[in-house]
């Protein structure tokens, strides 16, 4: 890590991803008296100042948030449970379910495909997903034989072009599934975003972190 980035031992760095998680984290930050001074949707900056000079926000890919926190490039961050299940929790402490960015991870298939019968018959299914580790564990527990195909987006396209029999993806309203003639057949897990903290930072910067964590916990409890 460069000395310029880690300029002050009192500096707190929060890792966030653009989009829904960023927007839904803003009220929690405001509850802690912290306001982000720039909008990542309009700014090209990846390090954003806040109203607290000792707190800054870095903008990273959602899947990279746990990595930045684990290795200490960020002291804390907000990541979906889906990301944490794939990444693992080494070096991380996840004290708070923030009750934001809620959705579910589910299995979906083309309308008309008899998923239950295929499973009963012991068919080997091809499944396209971004969440390979979680999907592998889910199907293994159910005794379903699958070939997992790693994709990074547009999961719904897999069954439409013959790449896969099914998909495992996040579902919110189900609108995208319906638009692509897919149906949700099995829920794997409910998803929400969690606050994750670097374990070393929790010890070394506890005095600075604790008021923010407490404010996040109180504000998120109101959303439950």
Curated annotation (Swiss-Prot):
InterPro entries assigned: ATP_PRibTrfase_cat (IPR013820), ATP_PRibTrfase_CS (IPR018198), ATP_PRibTrfase_HisG (IPR001348), ATP_PRibTrfase_HisG_short (IPR024893)
UniProt cross-references to NCBIfam families, sorted A to Z: hisG
Protein name: ATP phosphoribosyltransferase
EC number of the protein: 2.4.2.17
Subcellular location: Cytoplasm
One GO cellular component term: cytoplasm
Keywords for the protein's UniProt record, in alphabetical order: Amino-acid biosynthesis, ATP-binding, Cytoplasm, Glycosyltransferase, Histidine biosynthesis, Nucleotide-binding, Transferase
Family per record: Belongs to the ATP phosphoribosyltransferase family. Short subfamily.
Organism: Cupriavidus pinatubonensis (strain JMP 134 / LMG 1197)
Function: Catalyzes the condensation of ATP and 5-phosphoribose 1-diphosphate to form N'-(5'-phosphoribosyl)-ATP (PR-ATP). Has a crucial role in the pathway because the rate of histidine biosynthesis seems to be controlled primarily by regulation of HisG enzymatic activity.
PROSITE patterns: ATP_P_PHORIBOSYLTR (PS01316)
Top-rank EC class of the record's enzyme: transferase
GO molecular-function term, one example from the UniProt record: ATP binding
Complex formation: Heteromultimer composed of HisG and HisZ subunits.
Record note on domains: Lacks the C-terminal regulatory region which is replaced by HisZ.
Main location: cytoplasm
Pathway where this protein functions: Amino-acid biosynthesis; L-histidine biosynthesis; L-histidine from 5-phospho-alpha-D-ribose 1-diphosphate: step 1/9
Biological process terms in GO annotation: L-histidine biosynthetic process
Catalytically driven reaction(s): 1-(5-phospho-beta-D-ribosyl)-ATP + diphosphate = 5-phospho-alpha-D-ribose 1-diphosphate + ATP
CDD domains for this protein: PBP2_HisGs (cd13595)
Pfam families to which the protein is assigned, alphabetical: HisG
């Amino acid at each position: 890590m460069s000395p310029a980035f880690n300029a002050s031992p009192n500096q707190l760095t929060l890792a966030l991803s653009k989009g829904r998680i960023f927007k839904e984290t803003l009220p929690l930050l405001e509850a802690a008296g912290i306001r982000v001074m720039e909008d990542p949707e309009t700014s090209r900056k990846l390090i954003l100042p806040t109203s607290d000079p000792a707190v800054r926000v870095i903008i990273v890919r959602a899947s990279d948030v746990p990595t930045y926190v684990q290795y200490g490039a960020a002291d804390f961050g907000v990541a979906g449970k889906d990301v944490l299940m794939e990444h693992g929790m080494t070096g991380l402490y996840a004290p708070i379910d923030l009750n934001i960015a809620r959705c579910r991870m589910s299995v979906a298939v083309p309308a008309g495909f008899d998923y239950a019968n295929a499973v009963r018959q012991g068919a080997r299914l091809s499944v396209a997903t971004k969440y390979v580790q979680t999907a592998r564990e889910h199907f293994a527990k159910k005794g379903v034989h699958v070939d997992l195909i790693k994709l990074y987006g547009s999961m719904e396209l897999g069954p439409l072009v013959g790449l896969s029999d099914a998909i495992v993806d996040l579902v919110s309203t189900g609108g995208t599934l319906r638009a692509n003639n897919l149906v949700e057949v099995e829920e794997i897990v409910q998803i929400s975003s969690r606050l994750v903290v670097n374990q070393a930072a929790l010890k070394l910067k506890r005095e600075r972190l604790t008021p923010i964590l407490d404010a996040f916990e109180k504000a998120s409890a109101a959303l439950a």
